[in-house]
């Protein structure tokens, strides 16, 4: 056990938050740190156990007793802690996970004074702010379609070769390429039937995929021949002579083999622009063959913002597609990419700017109220449910009648006690 002591110079806030206690049957631990706060600068880590507060044994303290002990500190706060084990990069990973895996909301404090404190709990269906985004890694790997017996949607290099017509040549075909059932740029909610079930309608998600262009032709000396001599030896001439898939005529001389069929070289062309495909990649979709340019124009998605065709990285968010450089934070104007973002009045915000502009703090502990935290509104402020206690006896007032004096809540027993 790695025990260490820290002394934080006052005044509050101290820059950390506790969880657990004797009343929870769990040790007091540091649950959250304020970035750049006093505790973080002193080397305190998330998950560290609190051994003592001002030499008072913390193992015998309840959660409220520990809070009161810390609140009583004015000039300095002395803590003895036990270091929790953090794997390499663990703290950063925990921080990222906690900030991106839960929905976060902005809470506007009520200006009216409540005489009955009502608890609220942040849930995906409540709150006025937009939902949080859980980034999802999604990559589509296009299949290469080699010009031999096989099927797929992919670019393919084509080679022109001539061979003597009086020799019998076997067709050399490379290994079959992976089979793809659709174009490589389809959105995930089209190709994945379970997409709508995994992402609730009131949530938004971002997915970055890659739209891959056709491969460049390989050097001539490294290619496998896809043009073969059509004339075979007399013994095989009746069965081995190929037929053109375009004109259905017998091919005499060299020919192209692709997708399990044969073509005259001058008839193996894009079905739209009619450009010959004997040198370059091609795409096959629903039995038709396209060059890379025509395929992009026909099947590549359009950006929901600029309406232009997307090539390269595709940003999937709010069930639409964007260029990465078109989906920006409304405040800092930087690309959000695969990070969490929040919607406010129809505009996306990165996590840092959203918390800066719309975040709400607890009036009791001065810490931010995070998504998932139980909280209540009283006396014109927002409070964590564990922070709304009587200012004198520290009894929890959640759901109970209370009195107020100098903006501080009091229970019935201390309603007329001096502060």
From Swiss-Prot:
Locations of Polar residues compositional bias?
Answer: 204-232
Under InterPro entries, the record lists: PDZ, PDZ-LIM_domain, PDZ_sf, Znf_LIM
Task: Tell me the keywords, alphabetical order.
Answer: Cytoplasm, Cytoskeleton, LIM domain, Metal-binding, Repeat, Zinc
One GO MF term on file is: muscle alpha-actinin binding
Q: Which residues form the PDZ domain?
A: 1-85
GO BP of this protein: actin cytoskeleton organization; atrial ventricular junction remodeling; atrioventricular valve formation; embryonic heart tube morphogenesis; heart development; heart looping; muscle structure development; pectoral fin development
Q: What PROSITE patterns is this protein classified in?
A: LIM_DOMAIN_1, LIM_DOMAIN_2, PDZ
* Compartment(s) where it occurs, according to its Swiss-Prot or TrEMBL record: Cytoplasm, Cytoskeleton
Region of interest: Disordered = 174-232
The residue ranges of the LIM zinc-binding domain are 242-300, 301-360, 361-419
- GO cellular component terms listed in the entry, alphabetical order: actin cytoskeleton; adherens junction; cytoplasm; filamentous actin; perinuclear region of cytoplasm; stress fiber; Z disc
PANTHER family, per database record: PDZ AND LIM DOMAIN PROTEIN 7, PDZ AND LIM DOMAIN PROTEIN ZASP
Q: What is known of its domains?
A: The LIM zinc-binding 3 (LIM 3) domain provides the structural basis for recognition of tyrosine-containing tight turn structures.
Q: What does this protein do?
A: May function as a scaffold on which the coordinated assembly of proteins can occur. May play a role as an adapter that, via its PDZ domain, localizes LIM-binding proteins to actin filaments of both skeletal muscle and nonmuscle tissues.
**What name does UniProt use for this protein?**
PDZ and LIM domain protein 7
Origin organism is: Danio rerio (Zebrafish)
């Amino acid at each position: 056990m790695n025990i260490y002591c820290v002394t934080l110079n006052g005044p509050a806030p101290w820059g950390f938050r506790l969880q657990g206690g004797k009343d929870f049957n769990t040790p007091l631990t540091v649950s959250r740190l304020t970035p750049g706060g006093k505790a973080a600068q002193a080397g305190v880590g998330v998950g560290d156990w609190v051994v003592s507060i001002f030499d008072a044994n913390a193992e015998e303290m309840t959660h409220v007793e520990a809070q009161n002990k810390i609140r009583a500190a004015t000039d300095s706060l002395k803590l003895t802690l036990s270091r929790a084990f953090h794997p390499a990069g663990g703290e950063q990973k925990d921080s990222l996970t906690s900030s991106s895996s839960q929905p976060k909301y902005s809470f506007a404090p009520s200006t009216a004074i409540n005489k009955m404190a009502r608890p609220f709990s942040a849930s995906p269906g409540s709150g006025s702010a937009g939902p949080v985004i859980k980034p999802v890694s999604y990559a589509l790997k296009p299949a290469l379609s080699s010009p031999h017996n096989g099927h797929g949607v992919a670019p393919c290099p084509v080679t022109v070769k001539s061979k003597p017509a009086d020799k019998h040549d076997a067709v050399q075909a490379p290994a079959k390429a992976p089979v793809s059932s659709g174009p490589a740029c389809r959105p995930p909610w089209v190709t994945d039937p379970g997409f709508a079930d995994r992402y609730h309608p009131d949530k938004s998600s971002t997915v970055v995929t890659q739209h891959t262009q056709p491969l460049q032709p390989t050097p001539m000396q490294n290619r496998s021949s896809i043009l073969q001599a059509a004339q075979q030896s007399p013994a095989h001439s009746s069965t081995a002579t190929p037929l053109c898939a375009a004109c259905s005529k017998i091919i005499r001389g060299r020919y192209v083999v692709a997708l399990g069929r044969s073509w005259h070289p001058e008839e193996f062309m894009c079905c739209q622009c009619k450009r010959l495909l004997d040198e370059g990649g091609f795409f096959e979709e629903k039995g038709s063959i396209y060059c890379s340019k025509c395929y992009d124009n026909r099947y590549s998605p359009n950006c929901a913002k600029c309406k232009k065709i997307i090539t390269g990285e595709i940003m999937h968010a709010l069930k639409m597609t964007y260029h990465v450089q078109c989906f920006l934070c409304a405040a800092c104007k930087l690309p959000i990419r695969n990070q969490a973002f929040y919607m406010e009045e129809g505009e996306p915000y990165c996590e840092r700017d959203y918390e800066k502009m719309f975040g709400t703090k607890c009036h009791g502990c001065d810490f931010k109220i995070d998504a998932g935290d139980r909280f209540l509104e009283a006396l014109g402020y927002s409070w964590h449910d564990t922070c709304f206690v009587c200012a004198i006896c520290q009894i929890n007032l959640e759901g109970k009648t209370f009195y107020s004096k100098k903006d501080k809540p009091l229970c019935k027993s201390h309603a007329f006690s001096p502060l």
